[in-house]
Design a protein with these regions (language model features):
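ATP-driven catalytic headpiece of P-type ATPases
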Residues: 107, 329, 453-502, 532-611, ...
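Soluble-to-membrane junctions at the N-terminal ends of transmembrane alpha-helices
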Residues: 91-114, 166-189, 353-386, 402, ...
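Conserved ATP-binding TGD loop and adjacent catalytic N/P-domain core of P-type ATPases
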Residues: 1, 281, 288, 362, ...
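Conserved cytosolic catalytic loops of P-type ATPases
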Residues: 28-46, 50, 220-222, 251-346, ...
Length: 779
């Protein structure tokens, strides 16, 4: 399978989006289509053996729109995500496109208003009692009034010709859009007005001067057509401006990337180059205050790096030789050199931007209902408008009243409000998530997370740091009560025995010794005893390190209950012996993260059941669980990596929606099995297989924040869908005159156009409220 992105031109409303989707979905070999109305783009998964990008573009063209490939022939991974696409940071962002559209629309709007003001004044002045020049009030000059209105209308029609071109084109293709509603409504007003002018001409020719003036006053709708076009443009302009703000998070990420960087040659000379020209393996220098241009590994120097743009973590991270640095993070203090490892589309920044854009290109399940409604909305509105015209003619016999209501129905209807409700909120929600270091890979993941009833936490690397550390150093006591050796001597003994071991516990002990400046001595006759520990000889001394079983086999007495006490605290004790006597104990534990207990409390406050899954024995697992506020019933212990997926499935079979949180190292099957998989603390490796959501930081609180953001986003979408349906449900009958017997009031097409424009603006504005989202469970 391949996945391509296409730029799609000519889409103006939700109906357009639905038509493009249908046209491409019908092609053989197309697996899925996701059309993004906001970005004017389309993401297509297809079989290259059955259909080509040219075939897809042709299908879009036949539907009445234009399409061109942005990326082609990209192979997709098993999870469907694109690999090796062009660097997102170097693509034109949707925000830039929308700003360009808004700029052109502003020019159209200014011209429209310049001509609309005199047109409206002249056309409505006689009804509102406004003073008018005698040339427009004298009965003998009634044709002058009509011709002046027509001349003022022509520039408005000219600058807004896109409504007519796109609208009638959609009618020809049998797929009417919102532009068709505007085009037919405005055309009907203009056509009736032109017909009235011919009647006026006949009346003037027959000397019926007064009748001609009355015909003009009652039947000229040029100002209505001009007002409809201008108000729709006002609404479109405001809508486009608002939509351009929804992509602010992506735009901010793109702007973080520096344009130039400093390359350090082998002879030490430094040269400023464009970031696009950097190759993996090159050495670069970064000075205080500069943004890091690409991903890499520090070679010399040290500094504090601000990674908040990528992870949301406000505290700068200390970096020294051997540490990784990422593009778009900011060097705060010292100067350092680093070797480039990932450039262009492979950097963390580019991958984050691509993830956010891919999420925006997908559809949330909640959008399907709106898409179905939008697909049939316009034809239904045309039918209602026709019925309205016929009904008014039958009841009143007045073409004016029938035309007024029929046109009002056309222009008040707004499929855009329905179509915008979901994609705008998804774009703002995923963008806000990116700002917080929470990356949703799809709109479906964003929606599904709100329904999660159980969160399963993988212990190692999720609840705990995933890196064992020394917690206790206990020196043994001789029979006379004196210490067997000093604490430093015990650590020297431990270092000598553990320096050759690759066991994680040995690494923890060596790290502690390094911190204290203790250098490991050389030993002889080193031997590993499987499942027990190690033995060796240091000079004339026989030394050993291991568990209780090894000590027992060596005839060394260990104080009763000591091993059990450490195990109950979630610690692993290592016993050290010298010449047949116990020298001391060093306890090692995988430390619990500072925020894990707070995160468990936060998840409970959201009504979520929390479970911990681990391969540790139950005693150790329950000790960790107690420290974070979990009961023994909420612990699933002694689980092999291959069995984690089975335990998640069992929870699902019990009727729970499950979110699995892990580091993506040995729990990928469980992440994939869960209703929502969250990979935590992945840093630069953001494309974890199986994960639906990537949490950039190692903070478990982000799980609670992600659930809150999901709920806030879907709540926002439901609000918009409700008001869009409510607006159309009330507005269309009102325009048709259903309430006329009660109110005695007939809705003007001009008010209908204003209401239609405001409805879309309101939907977008409501979605923009998500930009100020703050989780209630924040620290």
């Amino acid at each position: 399978m391949a996945q391509d992105t296409f730029d799609v031109g000519g889409m103006t409303c939700a109906a357009c989006q639905a038509h493009v989707d249908r046209a491409v979905s019908k092609l053989d070999g197309v697996q899925s289509v996701a059309v993004n109305l906001l970005a004017g783009s389309m993401l297509v998964d297809y079989d290259p053996a059955q259909v080509s990008p040219d075939d897809i573009c042709t299908a879009v063209d036949r539907a009445g729109y234009s399409a061109s490939p942005v990326s082609t022939g990209t192979e997709t991974a098993p999870n469907g995500s694109a690999q090796a696409r062009s660097g997102a940071a170097h693509m034109e962002s949707p925000t830039k496109k929308l700003e360009a559209v808004a700029s052109a629309m502003r020019t159209r709007l200014i011209i429209s208003i310049i001509f609309l003001i005199p047109l409206f004044y002249i056309g409505m002045g006689h009804m509102l009692g406004w003073p008018l020049p005698s040339v427009f009030t004298d009965h003998t000059h009634s044709m002058t009034l009509a011709l002046t209105e027509l001349v003022l209308l022509i520039p408005i029609v000219y600058v807004n010709d896109a409504y007519f071109i796109n609208g009638f084109k959609s009618l020809v293709h049998g797929a009417p859009t919102m532009d068709a509603l505007i085009a037919v409504g405005a055309t009907a007003s203009i056509a009736w007005s032109l017909y009235a002018m011919f009647i006026m001409a006949d009346q003037l020719a027959a000397g019926q001067i007064h009748e001609a003036m009355m015909t003009g006053m009652d039947n000229l709708y040029f100002e209505s057509a001009g007002t409809i076009l201008s108000l729709v443009t006002v609404g479109k302009y405001l809508e486009t401006r608002s939509k351009s703000k929804t992509g602010g998070a992506i735009e901010a990420l793109i702007d973080l990337a520096p344009k130039t960087a400093t390359i350090v040659a082998d002879d030490g000379t430094e040269t400023a180059v464009e970031v696009d020209s950097i190759l993996p393996g090159q050495v670069l220098r970064v000075r205080p205050g500069e943004s890091i241009p690409v991903d890499g590994v520090v070679l010399e120097g040290s500094s504090a790096v601000d990674e908040s743009a990528l992870t949301g973590e406000s505290i700068p991270v200390e970096k020294t030789a051997g540490d990784t640095v990422n593009a778009a993070t900011v060097n705060r203090t010292g100067s350092f050199t680093f070797r480039a490892t990932r450039v262009g589309a492979d950097t963390s920044l580019a991958k984050i931007i691509q993830l956010v854009e891919d999420a925006n290109a997908t559809k949330a399940p909640i959008a399907r209902m709106a898409d179905k409604v939008a697909g049939v909305f316009v034809p239904v509105v045309f039918a209602i408008s026709a019925v309205t015209f016929v009904a008014w003619m039958a009841l009143t016999g007045s073409v004016n009243e029938a035309l007024t209501s029929a046109v009002a129905v056309l222009v008040i209807s707004c499929p855009c409000a329905l179509g915008l409700a979901t994609p705008v909120a998804i774009m703002v929600g995923t963008g806000k998530g990116a700002e917080m270091g929470i990356l949703f890979k799809s709109a479906e993941a964003l929606e599904n997370l709100r329904n999660v009833g159980t969160v399963v936490l993988d212990k190692t690397g999720t609840v705990t740091r995933g890196k064992p550390a020394v917690t206790d150093i206990v020196v043994a006591t001789r029979t006379d009560g004196s210490p067997a050796m000093s604490e430093k001597a015990l650590l020297k003994l431990a270092a000598a025995l553990e320096r050759q071991s690759e066991h994680p516990l040995a690494e923890a002990i060596m790290a502690e010794c390094e911190t204290r400046g203790i250098v490991a001595r050389m030993v002889e006759d080193f031997a590993a005893v499987p499942g027990r520990g190690v033995t060796a000889r240091e000079g004339q001394n026989v030394i050993a390190a291991g568990n209780v079983r090894l000590m027992s086999e060596l005839g060394i007495t260990v104080p009763a209950g000591l091993a059990e006490r450490f195990a109950a605290e979630g610690k692993t004790p290592l016993f050290f012996a010298k010449n047949g006597e116990l020298a001391g104990i060093v306890a090692v534990a995988d430390e619990v993260k500072e925020t894990s207990a707070e995160a468990v409390t936060a998840l409970r406050s959201l009504g979520v059941d929390v479970r911990m899954l681990t391969g540790d024995n139950r005693v150790t697992a329950e000790a960790i669980a107690r420290r974070v506020g979990l009961t023994s019933e909420q612990v699933i212990a002694d689980v092999l990596p291959a069995d984690k997926e089975r335990h998640v499935r069992e929870l699902q079979d019990a009727g729970s929606k499950v979110a699995m949180v892990g580091d993506g190292i040995n729990d990928s099957p469980a992440l994939a099995r869960a209703d929502v998989g969250l990979a935590i603390g992945t840093g630069a490796d953001i494309a974890k297989e199986g994960a639906d959501v990537v949490l950039m930081r190692s903070d478990l609180m982000d799980v609670a924040h992600a659930i809150e953001l999901s709920r806030a986003t879907i709540r926002n979408i439901k609000q918009d869908l409700f008001w869009a349906l409510f607006y159309n449900g009330i507005g269309i009958p009102l325009a048709a005159g259903v309430f006329f017997p009660l109110t005695g009031w007939q809705l003007s097409p001009m008010f209908g156009a204003a209401a239609m424009s405001l409805s879309s603006v309101c939907v977008v504005s409501n979605a923009l409220r998500l930009k100020s989202f703050k989780p209630k469970t924040a620290h």
